[in-house]
């Protein structure tokens, strides 16, 4: 039986423009939440982390946000846990998709066609 952890709508890099002085605190809370998801996946010894859309709030997150996510996904990979990431409405698959510009550890679904892949511990596998 497959043991998985599902997460979505994390929105790393959200601006929180209307939050005024509290915007930075909210942005940090998103990073902390993602780190807790990774830690939970490891402590619960899941086999797969499924991120079902909107890991990022846009296709243009900061370098620091991308670096943070890469570090967290690498931590997951080092624990032998696969990550499967589906782009969402905020970080959608377009020509300039963050998932096409950066190499993330895990499997990125970048093709709307039915795909069957064996997930192995390796850098991101493209579905096309």
Where are these regions (language model features)?
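N-terminal active-site segment of His-dependent metallophosphoesterases
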Residues: 1-68
